[in-house]
Amino acid sequence: MRGLLPLSNQEIDDALNSHHDLIAPPSSYAYLISLRALRKPLLVITASSKAAEDLAKEIREFHSDTLEFPAWETLPHERLSPSSDTVAKRISTLQSLQDKSRNWVVIAPIRAVIHRFNSQIINTKPILIDRGAEFDLTELQRELVSFSYSRTDLVERRGEFAVRGGILDIFPPDQNHPIRIDFFGDEIEDLSYFAVADQRTFESISSGVKVLPCRELLITDEIRTKARNLATKYENELLNKISNGMLPEGMESLIPMLVDKLELITASMPKNFESIFNLKK
């Protein structure tokens, strides 16, 4: 940092916007990127997921409007689904980017940048659950199924929900603990976190919670119809299961067949964004 210390923030910013090289140690990258973000939104591309995660933590210390867009842990054609918390981060970032008034810094590994995703998830509004809100419980269950949640007898994993009388348990992908929703008629009376181990509530939730989809392929009526039509042409176990409203492991591998519009993360960035490549391993 010794070469940077005599410079003011303005001088550093001017240097970053000039055609001259600015030599600086890796430890200063986060600070320099945050300065650059004062002028325009940035897409910072890293070599690996670990590098993206580490750099995002550092940049967030200087620039609060920092988002992560992680890559799937799986390859596109593997019969495995990406983890629900990865999906939640990706969807949350894409929805945050709809606010074009802020100078976002998006950190993404190169695999995430070149991977086309289902653009339908951008405009899928989260379900807001809060005390006093009213829902038809049957309709809410349908919405959760369309968000690719699985109904079970007991909620133990992210992406599951269960219903017992006027109580709905759900484990959103971006939460550390599942949530118990107590209904009085159609009105939400109470919200609490509960433990998976003993299924007992341990903390009341004071504010509303946004329920995001837990998969990037949403099992809508349109998707089920497409899967059913394709299943008549191609013998495929995944297509058969999707057409019946099931959520098979690895169903995301069929997104290119079932979804008409696929996009890159660059399409969701503000128009004046700038890319920064930090591809050192």
Which residues does each PLM region occupy?
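ASCE RecA-like P-loop NTPase motor cores
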Residues: M1-K281
